């Protein structure tokens, strides 16, 4: 029931995805060969959200892995859980996208997309009642951004009523891997605004800060960063996979978090933050979890929620705890920080509780917030984009693949519109809306 089909694309997406499957396999007690070695029936009860049970009793992830070069795929295949994936579900090219969005979206990626869609269709047909898709990718490179958004738009055409959730790694402000990141990211956001239902925004710099400041790791590796991301990813869907007192699924999440369809870019956080291999030495309390979860330093993207206001937020608690205490703490947060929540959406924080905590913790929580301060990320990318686009720098790489400058202009203005929409709702008050409605009524009367 309620299956989720997982798709990972590009180097970043495949590395995050591989980590995510390690976490989910561990939670469900599935070993690297796909055999169940767990101890609790709860692990198997809804294992089919993410796994297909093969005839020989092995569990195979509902995962599609794609890339335009074989390198990362090979390292996934030789990694700890590499043997668990279905071999046919590795789809890769040989040429690479060379950090070029146009190659991923129009030329190299477009040649490979049909074979990816075939695998997606095959996996979707194996589902009893497909709930939606989750896509892991980065927006700075060529494959994850260009081909990732191409795949999302194709899936959107074919499965219009299924949820589309993305975990998108944005280019970070100070850490840049490639000079054309602002181009790739802007072109991708242009697509995500239209075709995705929910985007969890991540970025490496915020993750570095968490590793460095909170976890005291002196030289964080991508493995440490991906460990944080995978904890959050597992938290988002734990309600689907384990029984809970208050359940949530991808659609409930969307209904509660998205007041306006274009504003579906969320900040995510996780508490308690732990580094790989370290164990918590004392159990946290619900108030401590709540406090850590709302902390700005905990957000996995480089935008400060204190610079904006929350339109909506959702908290998913895991572990044995009293729902009453959870509700009290959530109301407490809203009362104490009421200026950070828009007053024209009352009760805008949803909470859900799942009984099974993550491995090695007694309780944990995942935070998803729809905050207007996320515009800081878009604004930053947009400024970098404009600086280069004004001089038409590096543009020949894109036009050479058949793109038109017009597409860049459109993507730029779509991004700027998004920023101003966030700003508009950040400044809106409950009273202004009343005036606005009067204007509308006036217009309707004229129209009649």
Curated annotation (Swiss-Prot):
Binding residues annotated for Mg(2+), in chain numbering: 69
Location in the cell: Cytoplasm, Cytoskeleton
Cofactor(s) required for function per UniProt: Mg(2+)
Binding site for GTP: 11, 69, 138, 142-144, 204, 226
Gene3D superfamilies xrefs: Helix hairpin bin (1.10.287.600), Tubulin/FtsZ, C-terminal domain (3.30.1330.20), Tubulin/FtsZ, GTPase domain (3.40.50.1440)
A single cellular component GO annotation: microtubule
PANTHER family given in the database record: TUBULIN (PTHR11588)
Record note on quaternary structure: Dimer of alpha and beta chains. A typical microtubule is a hollow water-filled tube with an outer diameter of 25 nm and an inner diameter of 15 nM. Alpha-beta heterodimers associate head-to-tail to form protofilaments running lengthwise along the microtubule wall with the beta-tubulin subunit facing the microtubule plus end conferring a structural polarity. Microtubules usually have 13 protofilaments but different protofilament numbers can be found in some organisms and specialized cells.
Full protein name: Tubulin beta-2 chain
Gene from which the chain derives: TUBB2
């Amino acid at each position: 029931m309620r299956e989720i089909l997982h798709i990972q694309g590009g180097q970043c997406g495949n590395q995050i995805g591989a980590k995510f499957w390690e976490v989910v396999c561990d939670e469900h007690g599935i070993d690297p060969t796909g055999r169940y070695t767990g101890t609790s029936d709860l692990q198997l009860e809804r294992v089919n959200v993410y796994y297909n049970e093969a005839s020989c009793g092995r569990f195979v992830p509902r995962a599609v892995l794609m890339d335009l070069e074989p390198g990362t795929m090979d390292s996934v295949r030789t990694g700890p859980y590499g043997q668990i994936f279905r071999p046919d579900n590795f789809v890769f090219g040989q040429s690479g996208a060379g950090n070029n969005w146009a190659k991923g979206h129009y030329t190299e990626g477009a040649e490979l997309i049909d074979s990816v869609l075939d695998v997606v269709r095959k996996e979707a047909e194996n589902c009893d009642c497909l709930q939606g898709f989750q896509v892991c990718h980065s927006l700075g490179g060529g494959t994850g951004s260009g081909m990732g958004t191409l795949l999302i738009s194709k899936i959107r055409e074919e499965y219009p009523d299924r949820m589309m959730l993305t975990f998108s790694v944005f280019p970070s402000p100070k850490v840049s891997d490639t000079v054309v990141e602002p181009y790739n990211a802007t072109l991708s956001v242009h697509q995500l605004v239209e075709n995705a239902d929910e985007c969890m925004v991540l970025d490496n710099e915020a993750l570095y800060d968490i590793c460095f400041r909170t976890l005291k790791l002196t030289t964080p590796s991508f493995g440490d960063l991906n460990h944080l991301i995978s904890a959050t990813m597992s938290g988002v869907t734990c309600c689907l996979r384990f029984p809970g007192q208050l359940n949530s699924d991808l659609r409930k999440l969307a209904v509660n978090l998205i007041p306006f369809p274009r504003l579906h870019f969320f900040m995510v956080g996780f508490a308690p933050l732990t580094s790989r291999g370290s164990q918590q030495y004392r159990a946290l309390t619900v108030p401590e979890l709540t406090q850590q979860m709302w902390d700005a330093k905990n957000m996995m993207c480089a935008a400060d929620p204190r610079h904006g206001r929350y339109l909506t937020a959702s908290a998913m608690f895991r572990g044995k705890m009293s729902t009453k205490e959870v509700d009290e703490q959530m109301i407490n947060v809203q009362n104490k920080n009421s200026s950070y929540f828009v007053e024209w959406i009352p009760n805008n924080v949803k909470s859900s509780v799942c009984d099974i905590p993550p491995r090695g913790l007694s309780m944990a929580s995942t935070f998803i917030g729809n905050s207007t301060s996320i515009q800081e990320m878009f604004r930053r990318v947009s400024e970098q984009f404009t600086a280069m686009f004004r001089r038409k720098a590096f543009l020949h790489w894109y036009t050479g693949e058949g793109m038109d400058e017009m597409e860049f202009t459109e993507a730029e203005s779509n991004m700027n519109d998004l920023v101003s929409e966030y700003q508009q709702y950040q400044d809106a008050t409950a009273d202004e809306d009343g005036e606005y409605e009067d204007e509308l009524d006036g217009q309707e009367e004229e129209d009649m």
